[in-house]
């Protein structure tokens, strides 16, 4: 089941979706029969979903640096930020280990990345509270 969808900021034929059981997939709408798994590592690594519950929201994350984007821009998917029912806010990237930004004891129902200052993220938590996260550049360049 799909809970959230986001369209790539510059390649409008690429979208990313968040759904059940921790799944995050990207689709090239020109080839819709071949989804690209984002939330687990590739076949040469152990499958490692960042969460096991519903993914409530996904957004392309232009703030996180990807080591592979420059070398193969046409083939790579931008990193994706996601939040889940089990309280995880993380950045997932194709064939990379997830980068967990926040782990709460309640669901993170929604979030938004400030377009003017993309290091700032605001989260809506299940307990009717708001979380504000400011990301440092050093933490975002993890290999």
Where are each of the predicted segments found?
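Beta-propeller domains
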Residues: 1-27, 31-34
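Blade-level signature of beta-propeller repeat domains, shared across WD40, Kelch, NHL, RCC1
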Residues: 109-143
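Conserved strand-to-loop turn within each blade of WD40 beta-propeller repeats
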Residues: 18-21, 83-86, 124-127
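Short coil/turn linkers that define WD40 beta-propeller blade boundaries
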Residues: 32-34, 96-97, 138-140
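WD40-repeat beta-propellers
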Residues: 24-28, 89-94, 130-135
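Canonical WD40 repeat/beta-propeller blade segments in eukaryotic WD-repeat proteins
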Residues: 1-8, 50-72, 106-113
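A short beta-strand motif characteristic of beta-propeller blades
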Residues: 36-48, 97-102
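Structural hallmark of WD40 beta-propellers
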Residues: 11-16, 65-81, 98-99, 118-122
